[in-house]
């Protein structure tokens, strides 16, 4: 079973990804956050509670507060086994490559 965490400040974007992933029998969305800081806090809570961490995080780059690039940098340092895929739009190539430099495994176009 692949455990996914969705991190995006747009609630409807998270809902859209959730609906797409619900159809996959071997994927489960285990957590959602609206920004990088709350994503890290959620991961810390899961770790303290000895609950399984996500295998993959789908991370938006442009969010208020802590953006996806900084969150990716911090998460990959602390939890290097979690794969992060940066979510970006066509006009955000610099953000996608910044995410890769921060430790993301790849990126997806929204």
Question: Can you annotate each of these PLM segments?
Answer:
Residues 58-60, 71:
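Active-site T/S-Asp motif of two-component receiver
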Residues 1-13, 17-21, 57:
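Conserved acidic segment of CheY-like receiver
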């Amino acid at each position: 079973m692949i455990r996914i965490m969705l991190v995006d400040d747009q609630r409807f974007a998270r809902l859209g990804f959730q609906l797409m992933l619900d159809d996959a029998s071997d994927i489960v969305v285990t957590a959602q956050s609206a920004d990088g800081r709350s994503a890290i806090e959620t991961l810390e809570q899961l770790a303290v509670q000895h609950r399984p961490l996500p295998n993959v995080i789908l991370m938006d780059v442009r969010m208020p507060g802590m953006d996806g690039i900084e969150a990716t940098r911090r998460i990959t340092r602390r939890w290097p086994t979690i794969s992060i895929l940066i979510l970006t739009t066509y006009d955000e190539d610099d953000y996608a490559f910044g995410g890769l430099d921060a430790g993301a495994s790849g990126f997806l176009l929204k």
